């Protein structure tokens, strides 16, 4: 791995616009499960039936009981070396944009100043009626009956978690920013993503189509491996830790 890390470090230092995309694998080293493995969050349930706009509107009690069971452990998670190295690369000016499919807020907790969140964030919630946004602590409650459903303190409307639900469109501003970054990238890092979910999996394709080189940090193969210049099969934290050491960056 060392020789490949050294080569990639030189490319990163020489790049003018490096961009990273992170997926669930970036947070597994924080103790968080991914979504698509045999031990992932959707292993025993059809998520569309419960984490959807339809479920929130028609079965809010079931929605919030499942939501809290599946997601509440994310609120106490801490950043791991993946988040810390990427934040350090941003501070050093080596990484220009950071795009994530994750909703856990760990990039920000590690100090990343600018994160494009494609799937929303657990750090906030929004009223379905008036559209106001609030801290996520308002939905961190036990829901057993309709009287317990989190409601807007301003208008009384039902609160929706800040994550993008099934049946809901991705935020347009995030998609536009991510596409712009991918098209400008001369170096594109994929970190902890299986690249199975669109439209995020098309971002590295855009980068390559516009002349960017691709580095993939993922334990399992992806459909873009044949187009990658560098592939790291180690845990992302291990590979990025080696990269930070090669660059002389302390975390």
Curated annotation (Swiss-Prot):
Instruction: Look up the record and report any one GO term of the cellular component aspect.
Output: cytoplasm
**Which positions fall inside the Deacetylase sirtuin-type domain?**
1-250
Cellular location of this protein? Cytoplasm
Which cofactors does the annotated protein need, by name? Zn(2+)
Name the InterPro entries on file.
Answer: DHS-like_NAD/FAD-binding_dom, NAD-dep_sirtuin_deacylases, Sirtuin, Sirtuin_cat_small_dom_sf, Sirtuin_class_U, Ssirtuin_cat_dom
Please list the residues that bind NAD(+).
24, 28, 35-36, 101, 103-104, 119, 193-194, 218
Q: Which reaction does it catalyse?
A: N(6)-acetyl-L-lysyl-[protein] + NAD(+) + H2O = 2''-O-acetyl-ADP-D-ribose + nicotinamide + L-lysyl-[protein]
Query: Which residues catalyse the reaction?
Result: 119 (proton acceptor)
Give the UniProt keywords, A-Z.
Cytoplasm, Metal-binding, NAD, Transferase, Zinc
Molecular functions per Gene Ontology:
histone deacetylase activity, NAD-dependent; NAD+ binding; zinc ion binding
Q: What is its EC number?
A: 2.3.1.286
Q: Where does nicotinamide bind?
A: 35, 103-104
* Cofactor binding, per record: Binds 1 zinc ion per subunit.
Q: What residues bind Zn(2+), as annotated?
A: 127, 130, 152, 155
Q: Name one matching Pfam family.
A: SIR2
Q: Which family does it belong to?
A: Belongs to the sirtuin family. Class U subfamily.
Q: Which HAMAP family match?
A: Sirtuin_ClassU
Q: Say what the protein does.
A: NAD-dependent protein deacetylase which modulates the activities of several enzymes which are inactive in their acetylated form.
The protein in question is named: NAD-dependent protein deacetylase
